[in-house]
């Protein structure tokens, strides 16, 4: 990270050599390496590599994907975007989404549509040319947005709480040989007491009141629906490769950047931007959005307890550090 001057995310770049946020010429991207070796290169979805000051219609394009070894780009610049109304970029220009949520729009589907369009163009024009596609959907990063029918499929699935879910996941890991017999779960709050912020502590499920359990379980249902909906879109790409006889000659890597996020705070949020602005989430206020979680009316994120559960068997969570 320090050699490529990207020791922090672009929003945290400070100008010092190790964290300047701009790749030096001697550090090539995988796109540049493959492009130089005769590949077509495509980047779809999230690009969190462009400095903030360059993310504008008149901004410098030197750190944008087309300047970093990619023939085509379709997605968004930054850490996250609204899945119903995303800030879209095509190649080197900002664009409006091709349709609205009322017309069936969702970012995950749009990204898969564009990926398929590029792959079809490639297969039609230069079928013998190798290609590389970096497909990075906004999922499962917050905000957690999904079509209602996918959310409803998980109704009641998380009512037992995050501790019970952790136990279930660990048992399946041991059963499948992923973890050895005798493996024990990490503490629900793994930070040493002298380092922990008590306001960040995950409360045991048994200590939550009825409304909290209802809200927290619904947030997990939304996340699960979001996950499955995105899997379906990835599956469309895999299906196309199989239908065109390319799958057996394609390497598919599933990668994750940092696992489940703790940015939802112990109480979850109907608007994740509250966390970034230090605005507290009130249960009574959030309960008003119970039935609209995951829709265009919310910018929701699950509570930290689910981040702990969904990160089983990891002990720690990614979360921005503050001075407080």
Question: What does each model-found stretch correspond to?
Answer:
Residues 1-324:
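Formylglycine-dependent sulfatase
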